[in-house]
Amino acid sequence: MELLAGDPQPVEVPRDDGSTQRIYRCPTCQVALFSEYGRPEVRFVRGGTLDQPSVVEPDVHIFTRSRLRWVTLPDSVPAFEVYYDRKALWPAASLERLDAVLGPADSAA
């Protein structure tokens, strides 16, 4: 990910497991842009912030236990109430890229 302009504001938010995540927000409108979950090497970009979000489709839906009940999820995409075992779902090439960034031991979690 390359930040082209601006200076997003980090906001620490507690997680269910007692750790924290850092959500980076636009300092003007406070919209969430991306998150870090304890590892600044890996950022999770919010789909709605992309220039063309409709060209990216989700591979998985996570934390569905907190979704609004009127939100319907397609049966064709795996859904999990909490997180999931990425080794069971991610393509080998994606896991290899994560290993290259974090190291094999760290990316196993």
Go through each PLM region and give its residues:
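A short Gly-Trp-Pro
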Residues: 1-109
